[in-house]
């Protein structure tokens, strides 16, 4: 439950219309629950189905468009709730244009409480670490013309119970910097420096190549082009790898070419974990328009390379998305056993907003990540992870199917009832890569003892009172192996 305490101060003067920067909306904000409900019913057509986060400006435009269309009272309430949720990221509510000489500032805060029966956030693999904790956060933001900046520290004692958190867990008050960035936004280019979660892939799932499974980390992000065609790139330094011969500096680079034509979106991407003792940022990998695979082969740029592809299509009968990830794959002529490693891959597909009756919609998803995904033959220095958590998804060697109904029956409240089934093997990207002698006997998928987990549950969020928000995921698991 979140109680929002909002106080905004603005220094604005009228000015000529121009490109205006906007704050980004974090992926864990309740605004996305209302946005997803509207997208499933044909709204917010201006945003991508494959790249997040969105800016508050993008989401507000989508909410206003939904309010201008004919909808039931429940669907209209979603648009109103989305607009309300965005107030925490809107520094110029009066609609005036800011400039470097007339910036706008925002200061607001949240108080929240979390009740959980599992410390592990992946509820299909829930543990028994129950807790009830509290916390709070503060946002201080500024928008000045084409520049937007924010800092968002949080105090959250749930961190002490999360097995994925790499920080100290013996503190009376736990905290971290959740979001902190400065972003320059122009007509054909965006530059972002700071930390914020990102997701490339079907929006209802974690991205395979770039997802929000890790805690937010500092990075440089650039985007060049238009909404119809653009190149996005991200670069960051990861945690060091300590090996017997020294300390390896590790870096993560990824870039994605996105093309939108009418209701179709397609994307092609590369990811690279580069490493070395004393290594620094590599200009050939910082170049967003370079092709990593060519530098990897032709210029001897060592690293763990992955390739990805995404597709999304909006139709009158629902929105359909998919993602493919390819890791270790031998493409050169190499008859030796050392070059015949098992394939590393991932695949996901979703269907959202499939008409049922009235405002009710169906959804479905399937995702799979192979047993050797995110692992590297070179060892821990090439591991596709940040502080031990996959840069895309948290777990490998699994597949999961989910089916459910998106129910628009309560105003200002989203409800998704679902059934899910997961198969989880013992393949783990923290383990050493198999030796060449082990290749013939290493399963590519579902290694070792396989855990099977069916789950029935429901997830949703709502505005239950002015300034009070409630989100949750309740369900029952049954484990067998």
Protein language model annotation of sequence segments:
Residues 22, 41-50, 54-57, 62, ...:
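Outer-membrane beta-barrel channel domains
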Residues 109-111, 291-292, 481:
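Short, hydrophobic/proline-enriched secondary-structure or compact coil segments at domain edges
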Residues 19-41:
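Short N-terminal segments immediately surrounding and downstream of signal-peptide cleavage
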Residues 463-481:
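Predominantly the C-terminal beta-signal and adjacent terminal strand-loop region
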Residues 199, 219-391, 395-403, 408, ...:
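Signature for the C-terminal beta-barrel architecture of outer-membrane proteins
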Residues 13-19:
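Sec/Tat signal peptide C-region and signal peptidase I cleavage site
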Residues 2-13:
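Bacterial N-terminal signal peptides
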